[in-house]
Curated annotation (Swiss-Prot):
InterPro entries listed in its UniProt record: L-lactate/malate_DH, Lactate/malate_DH_C, Lactate/malate_DH_N, Lactate_DH/Glyco_Ohase_4_C, Malate_DH_AS, Malate_DH_type2, NAD(P)-bd_dom_sf
Pfam families listed in its UniProt record: Ldh_1_C (PF02866), Ldh_1_N (PF00056)
Alphabetized CDD domains for the sequence: MDH_chloroplast-like (cd01338)
Record's catalysed reaction(s): (S)-malate + NAD(+) = oxaloacetate + NADH + H(+)
Amino-acid positions noted as binding substrate in the UniProt annotation, renumbered to this chain: R92, R98, N131, R162
Keywords in alphabetical order: NAD, Oxidoreductase, Tricarboxylic acid cycle
Record-given protein name: Malate dehydrogenase
Described function: Catalyzes the reversible oxidation of malate to oxaloacetate.
Species assigned in the record: Methylococcus capsulatus (strain ATCC 33009 / NCIMB 11132 / Bath)
Binding site for NAD(+): G11, A12, A13, G14, Q15, I16, A17, N105, Q112, V129, G130, N131
Residue stretches in coiled coil: none
SUPFAM superfamilies per the UniProt record, alphabetical: LDH C-terminal domain-like, NAD(P)-binding Rossmann-fold domains
C-alpha cells in the first residue's frame, strides 16, 4: 500500500467539513488507491462534536482511511501535513462591519499561519475556504515565512463551478462541454466571472449568448449566488463548497486538463497589472503539483475595469490588516 497522505482540516466540526471529510475518506480526493491520514482541528468547545464526526468516519470502514487524529492544537494537527483545508473562520454577526470580521479572522489565521510555518510539510498545499478567504490566505501566508508563497491558495473554484454550470444550462449543454471560464479577483460580489475566453463545445461562448444576458444576468447571478442560496435555504453553501474544495485540491495534486484551466486564488506575480503579493483569483494551469498563471489573455476595457474594481477591494482589505502582515 502507498504511503498515506496527511490531510489536515480546520473547522472540522462545521457543515462544510461534514460534507467534505467522508468524501476524502473514501477516495474522492486522491483516488481509490491512495490512503490518507485525517487530522481534524476545531476549537475546544467543539470537541464533543468533533469526536462524534471521528466516530462516524470510523464507522464508514474505508480501507483508505488509515488514521484519524482530533485536536484543538494547530501545531499538532499541522505536523507533517501535506494538504490543508482551512475551513474554520468566524462568520459575520449582526452589526459586524467588514473591518470587524477581518480583524477577528486575522487573529485566527495569523496564529494558524505560524503553526503551519513550524510544523507542516515544506511541500504542503494549503487551501483557505473560510471567509474572507483571499485576505485570510494572505494573512496565513505572511505569517509562514519559511513556506513558499506557492504553498498557499484560496478558493474561487465554487464561483468557477457556478459560472460553468450557469453557462451550460443557458446553452443547453453538459458542463463537460464548457471550458476556459475565468473567475478574477476576490471571493466576494466584486469578483469578475469572465466569459471572453470561454468555450462551449469548442466555440467562443460569447458568440453563443446575448451580450445583454452576459452583463445583466450571468455576471450578477454568479456574483450573488452565495447570497441567493442563503436567502432560499436559510444557510450558506456547504455541500457545494465542499465539492469545490475537493475539485480545487484534486486539480492542484493531479493537474489540469490539456487546453483548459481552473480559477484559483494565488499570490499575484504582477500578471495583468495586479499588485504583487495580493491574493487574487487568476486562471491557472497545473502540472506536477505546480500552478502557473495563464499569461497574455487579451482584456478589453470592460474586463480591465472589472479587474480593477475587485483589486481595489482586496487592497482595502489588505490595508485593514496590515499590522499583521
Amino acid at each position: 500500500m502507498k504511503t498515506p497522505v496527511h490531510v489536515a482540516v480546520t473547522g472540522a466540526a462545521g457543515q462544510i467539513a461534514y460534507s467534505l471529510l467522508f468524501r476524502i475518506a473514501v477516495g474522492d480526493l486522491f483516488g481509490p488507491h491512495q490512503p490518507v491520514i485525517l487530522k481534524l482541528l476545531d476549537v475546544p468547545s467543539a470537541e464533543r462534536v468533533l469526536e462524534g464526526v471521528a466516530m462516524e468516519l470510523d464507522d464508514c470502514a474505508s480501507p483508505l482511511l488509515q488514521e484519524i487524529e482530533v485536536s484543538s492544537d494547530p501545531a499538532e494537527v499541522f505536523d507533517g501535513a501535506e494538504a490543508v483545508f482551512m475551513l474554520g473562520a468566524t462568520p459575520r454577526g449582526p452589526g459586524m462591519e467588514r473591518r470587524d470580521l477581518l480583524q477577528v479572522n486575522a487573529d485566527i489565521f495569523s496564529a494558524q499561519g505560524r503553526a503551519l510555518n513550524e510544523s507542516a510539510s515544506r511541500r504542503v498545499k494549503i487551501l483557505v475556504v473560510g471567509n474572507p478567504a483571499n485576505t485570510n490566505a494572505l494573512i496565513a501566508q505572511r505569517n509562514a515565512p519559511d513556506l513558499a508563497p506557492g504553498c498557499f491558495s484560496a478558493m474561487t473554484r465554487l464561483d468557477h463551478n457556478r459560472a460553468t454550470s450557469l453557462l451550460a444550462r443557458h446553452c443547453g449543454c453538459n458542463v463537460a462541454e464548457i471550458s476556459r471560464v475565468v473567475i478574477w479577483g476576490n471571493h466576494s460580489p466584486t469578483q469578475y466571472p469572465d466569459l471572453h475566453h470561454a468555450r462551449v463545445k469548442g466555440k467562443p461562448a460569447l458568440s453563443l449568448v446575448d451580450p445583454a444576458w452576459y452583463v445583466e444576468t450571468f455576471i450578477p447571478t454568479v456574483q450573488q449566488r452565495g447570497a441567493s442560496v442563503i436567502a432560499i435555504r436559510g444557510k450558506s453553501s456547504a455541500a457545494s463548497a465542499a465539492n469545490a474544495a475537493l475539485d480545487h485540491m484534486r486539480s492542484w495534486f493531479l493537474g489540469t486538463p490539456k487546453d483548459d484551466w481552473v480559477s484559483m486564488t494565488v499570490s499575484s506575480d504582477g500578471s495583468y497589472g495586479i499588485a504583487e503579493g495580493l491574493m487574487f483569483s487568476f486562471p491557472v494551469t497545473i502540472e506536477n503539483g505546480r500552478f502557473r498563471i495563464v499569461q497574455d489573455l487579451p482584456l478589453d476595457t470592460f474586463s480591465r475595469e472589472r479587474l480593477r474594481l475587485t483589486e481595489v477591494e482586496l487592497l482595502e482589505e489588505r490595508a485593514m490588516v496590515s499590522h499583521l502582515l
